[in-house]
From Swiss-Prot:
This is Torsin-4A. The gene is tor4a. Its main location: membrane. ATP binds at residues 192-199. Residues 1-28, 75-99 are annotated as: Disordered. GO terms for molecular function: ATP binding; ATP hydrolysis activity. It comes from Danio rerio.
Length: 409
């Protein structure tokens, strides 16, 4: 059965009432009619509003309005409840996974921006590499002007039996001449018996450095010649100090390293050694630190001779380097002699064998224009005296008498 309209039910009730009573008045009838009309108009307005709401809302979201009281159940708990049934429910837009590009620009995948710190790090590495490379180039340029390769060839050609000394000398010069600014001067101390080549190496060094830095920056000081007597010591001291100061100042101006060669140091007066010691102190002003001092003497030559003769059989087997073994003892001995040797690098010269003396004869005879006949050279070498240790022969005086023997030819 369908639901009966309330206005029809009310009208039926009103029509039945006059029939039952039969005696209702006209005024009562008219008031009832007016009430019925008002109810009907109100009902029609409510119905029209419901139809308008139903037509505006999509069919999927609409549900028939029930006049029965609403009872809460858990059946439709998952469905969203619209708090305002009068307002239309808006559709949620789904987010698209793809990237939307503007139509006015080229389509390109966005790139991740790289860190700028890496670029700065690369730039810093390049700068450091260039600085180091430039420093190495400058070191090479500074060494090249001293022509140490030419000095090495000269030592190999004219110095016999002192290979370790030549290698040590070139190593010290290479390290020191690589830079111009130093915190201390280079002090080299030559020691050994008579005739082993100490003064000869000093002359070769003087000739070489005169050719590369100039005559004014090389000084050869022979103690017995420049300061022969004790009365000359005060004058010699002032003259030496003044001369060294002038040469160092000139070296500073020309950015060159002066060379001072002192021969016969064993005869140098103590006052002169004290003055020289003050000039080469590492804590001295920078003016005196960029210089090379070479000290030549035969201090401790007797002990050096005994050491070489005692260890010659061991050294020939290659198990011992006489220079390395002799240096610690020589350092202690010379430091007790005077403080001038405290900061020195020691280069001990060994005894010369008979074969080395023969090389000296051949070289000297070639210089004097004689043909170096082998038998003649051996006969001249036999005239000298030697220390005999096993099968080895060491000359008492080295090559000192070679020049005199050749001059007698």
């Amino acid at each position: 059965m369908g639901e009966q309209d309330p206005s029809d039910r009310l009208r039926g009730d009103q029509l039945k009432e006059p029939n039952q009573n039969g005696k209702g008045s006209f005024s009562q009838f008219s008031s009832s009619v007016r009430a019925m009309v008002r109810i009907r108009m109100k009902y029609q307005a409510i119905k029209k509003r419901r139809m308008e709401i139903a037509s505006a809302t999509p069919q999927i979201f609409t549900s028939p309005r029930s006049t029965s009281p609403k009872v809460f159940t858990f059946d439709n708990l998952h469905e969203p409840v619209n708090s305002n049934p009068a307002s239309p429910r808006k559709r949620k837009k789904k987010r698209k996974g793809r990237v939307l590009y503007p139509t006015s620009s080229l389509r390109a995948v966005p790139t991740k921006e790289s860190s700028r710190a890496k670029n700065c790090l690369y730039l810093l590495c390049i700068i450091v590499f260039l600085q180091v490379y430039n420093a190495i180039e400058n070191l090479d340029d500074h060494v090249l002007k001293y022509d140490l390769e030419g000095l090495e060839k000269t030592l190999k050609r004219e110095v016999f039996g002192q290979q370790e000394v030549a290698e040590g000398l070139l190593g010290h010069l290479q390290d020191y001449l690589s830079t111009y600014v130093h915190n201390k001067p280079l002090v080299l101390s030559f020691h050994g018996p008579t005739g082993v080549g100490k003064s000869h190496v000093g002359r070769l060094l003087a000739q070489h450095f005169r050719s590369v830095v100039g005559e004014e920056l090389v000084m050869q000081y022979f103690v017995l010649h420049h300061c022969p007597t004790d009365d000359d010591i005060p004058v010699c001291t002032k003259s030496l100090e003044s001369h060294i100061s002038e040469m160092v100042s000139q070296g500073e101006e020309e950015e060159k390293i002066p060379v001072f060669i002192f021969d016969e140091v064993e005869h140098m007066p103590r006052q002169l050694m004290d003055t020289l010691r003050e000039l080469i102190q590492p804590q001295n002003s920078n003016k005196y630190l960029n210089a090379i001092y070479i000290l030549i003497s035969n201090l401790g030559h007797e002990d050096i001779t005994k050491f070489v003769l005692h260890n010659s059989s061991i050294a020939i087997s290659g198990r011992l380097s006489l220079t390395q073994e002799l240096t610690p003892w020589l350092r202690n001995y010379l430091q007790e002699h005077h403080g001038l040797f405290l900061d020195a690098e020691y280069l001990p010269f060994m005894l010369l064998e008979k074969s080395h003396v023969m090389d000296c004869f051949i070289d000297e005879m070639s210089r004097e224009g004689f043909y170096p006949d082998r038998s003649h050279v051996e006969r001249l070498a036999e005239e000298l005296s030697y220390y005999i240790v096993g099968e080895r022969e060491f000359s008492h005086t080295g090559c000192r008498q070679v020049v005199a023997k050749v001059n007698l030819l």
